[in-house]
Every structure is written in C-alpha cells, then in structure tokens.
C-alpha cells in the first residue's frame, strides 16, 4: 500500500521532469535541424532558403556537417563558387573552422588551385599557416599539388615555407626541393612576401 501511494506521488513529478527536459532540449534540437537545413540549402544553391535561415539565426553560418564536420564555407570552396563564398563571408563565416580531418577552406582552395577563392579567404583573415591533422599547411598542399599560382599567393601573404608537417617532418621548401625539377616552386617560395607576415594565432549574395 505504501509503495502504491509513493508511486502515485512520484509519477506526476517524473512526468513534469521529463517534460521539462524535453523543453530544455528543444532549442538545441531546433538549432541542429536549422543548421542541417541551412547546409542543405547551401549544397542545393538555394540562396533564398539560406538567407532566410540566417535571418532566423545568424550563428548557423558556421554550422558543421554532422558527418564530415565541414562548414558551408568549405562546401562552396570545394565547388569553386566565388559568389557563395563572398556571401557567406559577408554573413560572418569563420574561415578557420576545419573539418574532422583538420582541413580548412583555404586548404581546399590550395589543393584545387582556386586562387580567387583563396584570395577571398585570406582577405577575410584565414590563418595562412593553420595545419590539418597531418600537420600540413595550405602551402605544403599547394607545393605537393604543384599549384604554382597558389604557392605564389600564399607566399605573398606570409606563408611559412619552413614549417614541417607531422607525417614526414618535411616543409613546403623541402617538398619543393625534392619534387620540383624545374625549380619554379622553390623560386616562388624564396620570393619576398608583401609587407609584414600575417598574424596567424558591399558584397553580392548568391543567385
């Protein structure tokens, strides 16, 4: 009898607690759904939906994909979409956010020799010497891909050619010496950057 009375007393309290927990979780759930919907809009090039989502919650611009960990900025960089890149930057997209492998939008641009995109990212203070999980910088990736125009741009913006990776303990300069028989990349690396090296510690929207 005592147990039955006790249960009758506790049950309503338990229901209230569960309800309160669900209520507390709902904002986080709503943000997750909103972020995923925003990334889908970016992937589908739906400027209207993306803009509306950011009007509701401006922080969604830096949402990371639940599986890949990449942001909208990485998505549009990989498809070499300068219009969307400028739009996202104007909305406060953070170019330093990396995916699960530590790859940043600037690194994607370096691999693709997407110079226009890299320039936009660097103008937005993308860390030029940030490393991925292998310890590779954007400059190392550009040298490995033999993307001369990208090497020139990164060096111009103060990239450190002597920063070694974790995998082989080699720097961009080392890779250039080993792999570039023409000497072109090494010459670009030895060129002086414009101005002081970067501190690493009205825009049109998409149509």
PLM feature spans:
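Ankyrin repeat A-helix N-terminal signature
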Residues: 40-45, 75-81, 108-114, 141-147, ...
